[in-house]
Amino acid sequence: MIFLQRGMIALHRSKNSSVQNLVVQNLIVIWSMWRAREAPSSRRRCRFCDAYGPGYFFIPGTETCLKIGGRVRTEGEWYDAYNPNSKNGTLWHTRAELSVDTATDTEYGPLKTNTVVRWDWNDGNSTSTKLLFANISLGGFLVGKADSQYNNYMGYAGNVINDDVIYDGPKELNQLTYKYDAGNGFTAVISLEDSNSSSDTSSYGGAWQTGTGNHYAPDVVAGAGYKTGAWTLRVIGGYDSIVEEGAIKARVDADFGAFSAFLMGGWNTDGDKLNKYAGSYLNSNRSACPTNGADCGWGDWAFWTGASYQLNPKLQANAQVAYTDSKIFAATANVAWRPVKDLLVEPEVSYTNWDAADADQWAGVLRFERKF
């Protein structure tokens, strides 16, 4: 009897073992089928492109990296720092921008594109849409629409909103550009720029606009710079092929971490004329400028200086002062507050005096901007 009981127990254990083995085998099969089904999905998951900076990811099925970004901005303005005849005491302006960047690795370096579309909405149901930038770059070359290298290479004119009350150069134009970086602090740029395209054509005077009709020669911009430690020196020149005049700018930057400052000077080859590289946002077509619009340009020279100080991780103070041979004085100061990442709140106040127009203007801006 004891032998029979032991035999039944052994048989029962054998059956349990078989059942367990069968269950395990079935689980293995189910797991394998699940992994096989998931494998294609895993390959379709987003892959990031760390080589080109944050935000880039591979377009599925390609070796091209894509980055989508932009910003939304709304601001209230009190008078106009650029115009002593501004009639509106206040106005409200809202803007949205969408940027799309791509990058693909090639034997000549990254092949990149940059596209930015802008939408603006102003007081009085006024709205506009435009292609702000659209360009292709490879191996130091850039072709398409971008800001003039006369501005881009030099770093514009300070960390304030109204930074170009004293005109510092053209923006948003077609160009063929080559930039060189030696890797030891030395850089250089040369650019052929479309003489008939720019967002600022009303700033160069009537003679300039008359000359654009049958003109096809490009403008030429060339510059060089050197950076060592906290100091950077850059020089650039631009030749306006329509007016057959130009301008040169030189700039020194100092960056000591929390504190940075710059000094930039410009020379106009003919102080009695406006040209694309020494123009004016104040001319006889839009304000109180005298009949000779050049009186509201640089004259023979202009200079800009500015400084920024990081008060704490979320608060930065900025200031800029500019003056011209034609006795235009502009001063601006603001505070840039970033309460959270990618959100900017920026109040600013400006003062401008136009000696030739016997006029001055106080102006203010309160800006809210979210970048993504």
Where are these regions (language model features)?
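Outer-membrane beta-barrel "beta-signal"
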Residues: 30, 339, 359-372
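Transmembrane beta-barrel strands of outer-membrane/channel proteins
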Residues: 72-76, 115-119, 143-147, 190-194, ...
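N-terminal periplasmic/intermembrane-space "pro-region" immediately following the signal or transit peptide
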Residues: 1-69
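Outer membrane beta-barrel
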Residues: 55-78, 84-199, 218-227
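Residue-level signature of outer-membrane beta-barrel architecture
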Residues: 102-104, 138-140, 180-181, 226-228, ...
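Repeated loop/turn-to-beta-strand initiation elements of outer-membrane beta-barrel proteins
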Residues: 107-110, 140-144, 184-190, 230-235, ...
